Each structure stands twice: as structure tokens, then as C-alpha cells.
A protein has these predicted regions:
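A structural signal for multi-pass alpha-helical bundles of membrane permease subunits
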Residues: 16-304
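Short, Lys/Arg-rich, polar N-terminal cytosolic tail immediately upstream
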Residues: 1-15
Length: 304
């Protein structure tokens, strides 16, 4: 096999490489136009005090690090990071555990289980704005069937999204409902790839269901769990529709995560340069998290 691969590699000459590059060039140009160019422009704007009310500010590079240094002394920015940390940690942990539990329950090949898998995926395939509107209705006392049912039982509950103590956790609950099927799907796919032979041998030796999971299935699916958690962690940093629809960052700033804070700086106060700097820092954070968790996942893999 190695000899065959070496022969193929040596058989590709400059003309063939040029032909391959020519074929890929349209895709490369499109990728650069849609992603790299806007990202580069965002970075350039972050080096200026850009605001639409002062056109000359778009080309003012006299203090290129002012926005980044200013963020370090901005209490609302640091508060938004803390809110983001609480939201990300709670949702990723909850979604990973729920996804793992649901995957274990649905790891069977029956018609009922197949139907249940489809039902479990419904929240994930809904447009995010639709999911947000569903929870807006459920959290609004005047129209919520949940609140009306509790009121009929003489157990009235105040709106969770207008209470500073519960608003963030209400968003975390809605986000978990919407996205735990994603982690379930990835973990379920990994569970179905676990070799049958070790499981059967362990059953013959009298291993319990918990022992089968802990010593055989969990080590095998651990990389998939890490990947699922990584994707959800990155998506939690991009959280926007639920917060925009349910609380608009309130009450006060209790649900104002970092990207929503950048949104308000750009579109409420027209501080484009500062908002761009926040967006660049968020992007750098996402890349750093991707590298860190990817490295941890590679080390924890039984094949790594």
C-alpha cells in the first residue's frame, strides 16, 4: 500500500498540480471573498475609532490599540465576559450530559426508538428565531400555558425572564432544550460504532450495565463527547437570537453576553471601531478554545 501511494505521489507532476490548483481556485477565491476579506476589514476597522457620524474616523489609525486597551478598562465588557462564562458553562455541561443520557436511551434499533430519535431532533432543526419565540410565549405569564396551569393550581410564578435572578438561567434552559439533540446525535453515532465483541465478552464475564458503559463504551466515545462539547461551546459564544428575543440583554445587563454587548455598541451607540475590536477578541477566543479543546481531545483519545 505504501509503495502504491508513493508511486501515485511521485506520478503527480507540475502540470497535474497546476491543474488541481486551477480547479480549486474558484473555491479559494469564493472562500476568501466571503470570509477572509470581511474578517480582515473587521480587523482594520477595529484599529480605528470608527463611527458613521464621523466619516474621517474610518481612516484614523493614530491610536490603533485604543479600542483593545479600552476594553480592558470597560466594566460592562468585563461583566459581559462573566455573563458569557456562566451561560457557556451551564449550557455546555447540561447539553453534554443530557445528550449523553438521551444517546444511551436511544441506542437501540427498534421502530419506537427510531420515531423517538426524530422527535428529539425537532428542537434542533427549528429556526433559532422560532425556538426563541416559543420560549418567549412560554415565559410570558399572560399568554403562557405553563403559567396559566400553575395559576389554576394556586401556584402563580412570576416571569422568569424579567427577574434578574432567573433570567440568565431561563435562557440557559431554553438553549439546552434547543441544542442538546446536537450532542445526542454525535454521541449516538459514536455509540453505534462501539465494537460488539468486547461488550459481548464482558457480558459473558458478568459485567453490569454500568461497568459496560464505564470501562468499554465511555473510553471509546470520549473523543466524540469532546467534539460535541467543543461545537456547543463555540456556538454558546455566538448566542444571540434567544437573548435578543427573550430579554434584549436585560433585566439591566444580567443577560448581556459579550457578542450582544458588541451588538449594542455597534447599532445602539454607533461605536463601530470598538464593537469590531470586541468581535475580533471573541474570534480569537473561539480559535484558542478550538485549539485547546482539540488538543485535549487528541490526548484523551484511546487511539491518540
Amino acid at each position: 500500500m505504501a509503495a502504491a501511494v508513493a508511486t501515485i505521489e511521485h506520478g503527480i507532476g507540475p502540470r497535474q498540480r497546476l491543474a488541481v490548483l486551477s480547479g480549486l481556485m474558484p473555491a479559494i477565491v469564493l472562500l476568501a471573498a466571503l470570509t477572509l476579506a470581511p474578517a480582515l476589514y473587521l480587523f482594520v476597522i477595529s484599529l480605528t475609532p470608527a463611527t458613521p457620524t464621523v466619516p474621517a474616523s474610518l481612516t484614523d489609525f493614530s491610536a490603533p490599540l485604543q479600542n483593545y486597551l479600552g476594553a480592558l478598562h470597560d466594566a460592562r465588557f468585563t461583566d459581559s465576559l462573566w455573563v458569557q462564562l456562566k451561560l457557556s458553562a451551564s449550557t455546555v455541561i447540561a447539553q453534554t450530559l443530557l445528550g449523553l443520557g438521551a444517546a444511551l436511551l436511544l441506542n437501540h434499533r427498534t421502530r419506537l426508538v427510531q420515531a423517538l430519535r426524530t422527535v428529539f431532533l425537532i428542537p434542533m432543526v427549528l429556526p433559532p428565531i422560532v425556538a426563541a419565540l416559543i420560549w418567549k410565549i412560554l415565559y410570558t405569564p399572560d399568554i403562557s400555558p405553563m403559567h396559566r396551569a400553575l395559576a389554576a393550581l394556586n401556584m402563580p410564578v412570576k416571569s422568569l425572564i424579567t427577574n434578574p435572578d432567573t433570567a440568565l438561567w431561563a435562557i440557559a434552559f431554553a438553549d439546552t432544550w434547543e441544542w442538546f439533540p446536537f450532542t445526542m446525535l454525535i454521541i449516538l453515532a459514536a455509540l453505534q460504532m462501539v465494537p460488539r465483541e468486547p461488550l459481548e465478552a464482558a457480558r459473558v464475564d458478568g459485567a453490569s450495565r454500568l461497568q459496560l458503559f464505564w470501562y468499554i463504551e465511555l473510553p471509546f466515545i470520549q473523543p466524540a463527547i469532546v467534539v460535541a462539547a467543543l461545537f456547543r461551546l463555540i456556538d454558546s459564544i455566538k448566542a444571540f437570537p434567544l437573548i435578543y428575543v427573550l430579554t434584549s440583554g436585560g433585566p439591566g445587563t444580567t443577560t448581556q453576553v459579550t457578542n450582544y454587548y458588541a451588538f449594542t455598541q455597534a447599532f445602539n451607540y454607533a461605536y463601530w471601531g470598538y464593537a469590531s475590536a470586541i468581535a475580533i477578541m471573541l474570534t480569537a477566543g473561539v480559535f484558542a478554545l478550538s485549539w485547546l479543546i482539540g488538543s485535549l481531545g487528541a490526548r484523551s483519545s484511546p487511539h491518540g
